[in-house]
């Protein structure tokens, strides 16, 4: 009886510890879970607009990835580094400038607020991508028509 209680308690501890890590939801096959979101790294280069279109077609509320914290940025950098075996030096993210009357107006595609930024110093805020030279941590200004791999994201809750 004591062994049963010990094993049951151990399983309960494992379950409770996993439930706080996002293990309480499922992402589709090939997608990776992090902090109640699902992520998919795509190696097939697209321009920014086609990459965004692809992401919106993959899942409800799907978009090019928005990065809301340093921790999420580190996760995305690790995800990208794991699939980048080619020579591409940038990876699209879902941030771009929607200029209005010559004013910079950067916005995330998914409508989330910009609460964390990691722009490379001196960069303007047009279409943004992660750069290979900083292990995919810094955000760089890139011509929106250039072809690069990208990362999709959607909320799993």
Swiss-Prot record:
Keywords: Disulfide bond, Hemostasis impairing toxin, Platelet aggregation inhibiting toxin, Secreted, Signal, Toxin. Its main location: secreted. Residues 34-153 form the C-type lectin domain. Coiled coil: none annotated. Disulfide bonds join 27-38, 55-152, 127-144. It holds the Pfam family Lectin_C. One of its GO terms (molecular function) is toxin activity. SUPFAM superfamilies: C-type lectin-like (SSF56436). Residues 1-23 form the signal peptide. It is found in: Secreted. Expressed by the venom gland. The record marks 84, 90, 133 as: Key residue for binding with integrin. GO terms for cellular component: extracellular region. Transmembrane segments: none annotated. PROSITE patterns: C_TYPE_LECTIN_2. Gene3D superfamilies: Mannose-Binding Protein A, subunit A. SMART domains: CLECT. Heterodimer of subunits A and B; disulfide-linked. Belongs to the snaclec family. EMS16 is a potent and selective inhibitor of alpha-2/beta-1 (ITGA2/ITGB1) integrin and acts as a potent antagonist of platelet aggregation and cell migration. Binds specifically to the I domain of the alpha-2 subunit, in a metal ion-independent fashion. This is Snaclec EMS16 subunit alpha. The lineage of its organism: Eukaryota, Metazoa, Chordata, Craniata, Vertebrata.
